[in-house]
UniProtKB/Swiss-Prot annotation:
GO cellular component: cytosol
Pfam family, one: H2O2_YaaD
Name listed for the protein in its UniProt record: UPF0246 protein Sde_3824
Protein family according to the UniProt entry: Belongs to the UPF0246 family.
Organism: Saccharophagus degradans (strain 2-40 / ATCC 43961 / DSM 17024)
Length: 256
């Protein structure tokens, strides 16, 4: 199985890191091309493009200006240890063993507006560039046009390497839109997490994001390789809901 997840807006470059062997991202030439265009923007342009405050616009302007193809311990850290949103709280990569990191390196990909598709231990300089950003570039009107089939091609290459025909989609819709399902050499399985509220089960964003991270960790820590094994997921009170599921969508529910 190959798991795909979204990145996070919040970053952590301060927490002491475990000793891990880092790797180099595969699509850095593409990243550099994007950065070249982003460096032309003024701080206020960054704010407008990303719909963020002037303070955050200046922060990300500075990040773009300082970005380079030289990745060091001083300016970068492994992606899975740099992102710090709800998904990554659930994933809790700081608790990974060496075996967990090794499995994740082969079976987990983080979709990224700037880096395309990252392995967990790929070094990453801090940035913010959401996949849905309408940043016009040499390849088209937005980042979906920029990445084209490259992310899908990278996933297909990894599916072949690990001998799998299953992609576990734990990414948001915004990010999974960068993948071309018809060109993907594998079945897409999408776990969905719902909470009991006001007399029915519904998706609550905060809990769903954390649960995507939990499911990713569950697969990694248990070294799962078969879709059927996902149905045993029972962390944080979730259980597989057969009645609400269909072939490709696995629904997990809980009553708090």
């Amino acid at each position: 199985m190959l798991i795909v997840i979204s990145p996070a807006k919040n970053l952590d470059y301060d927490t002491p890191m475990p000793k891990v062997k880092t790797t180099k991202a595969a699509m850095l030439e593409d990243s550099a091309e994007l950065i070249e265009g982003l460096k032309q923007l003024a701080p206020q342009d960054v704010s407008k493009l990303m719909h963020i405050s002037d303070k955050l616009g200046t922060l990300n302007y500075d990040r773009f200006q300082s970005w380079s193809l030289t990745f060091t311990k001083a300016n970068a850290r492994p992606a899975v240890l740099a992102f710090n949103g709800d998904v990554y709280v659930g994933l809790d990569a700081y608790s990974f063993t060496d075996e967990d990191f090794a499995f994740a390196q082969d079976h987990l990909r983080i979709l990224s507006g700037l880096y395309g598709a990252l392995r967990p231990l790929d070094l990453m300089q801090p940035y913010r560039l959401e996949m849905g950003t309408k940043f016009a570039n040499n390849r088209g009107k937005d980042l979906y046009a920029f990445w084209g089939s490259k992310i899908t091609d990278a996933l297909n290459k990894q599916l072949k390497k690990v001998g799998s025909e299953t992609v576990v989609n734990l990414a948001s819709n915004e990010y999974f839109k960068s993948v071309k399902p018809k060109a993907l050499n594998g079945e897409i399985i999408t776990p969905v997490f719902k909470e009991w509220k006001d007399g029915k089960y519904k998706i609550i964003s905060f809990f769903a994001k954390k649960a995507r991270g939990l499911m990713s960790a569950y697969i990694i820590k248990n070294k799962l390789t078969q879709v059927e094994q996902l149905k045993s997921f029972d962390w944080d009170g979730y259980t597989f809901n057969k009645a609400m599921s269909d072939g490709s969508e696995l629904v997990f529910t809980r009553k708090q």
